[in-house]
Amino acid sequence: MINLSKGGRVNLSKDDNGNKLSKVFFGANWGAIKSGGFLGFGGGTEAVDLDASVVLMDANKRKLETVYFGHKDSSDRAIHHSGDDLVGDTNGDDGMDNETISVELDRIRPEVEYVAFILNSYRHQRFDKIPYMGLRIYTTTDGRPVTRPNSNPNVLAKYNLDNDSNDPDTTFVGREAIILGYAYRKDGEWKFKALGNTGSWQSIGEIERVLPNFI
């Protein structure tokens, strides 16, 4: 397993043993905001509605299609969105995805060269208020995403998102969207490059307009 940081890469087409992979999952995970209380007691929980999306682009970095909770399947049926999570983890990290993007690599239509992964705040909650966020890339023996605490996926990579307030490109302060990274074709295989660029973009459309600058 690879612990990704900005600029890190992982092969999506083969596992650590060189076995060919046909289906991989991108699981986004985040926590609800704890508020109030004293010394860890009392207080409440504020639901956090983040949205995971993917943007498919051609070799010229032009958008072909976006898959998100309102359009769950790509036109070639290679990419599927699990659905909208409106809350986040309310009792700490439960080891499961809040939203999952499944990708069948061999079914992606040939004109797609890049698949960018995005996470943005639907309710415009700032990232520096959210206790944790992360992405993991994995496979499963049954071809299904992780929806049970006792699941044992084969994790290819983890990307724990950390606030670096000293880096204007990745700081969480005042930001509500992040370009997690992108998958790309290379020598007949699919690779993934982690980015972690944050912004104050308030919609998927705004992010789509700036995406080519990061790829």
Indicate residue ranges for each PLM-predicted region.
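Intrinsic-disorder/low-complexity signal
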Residues: 1-215
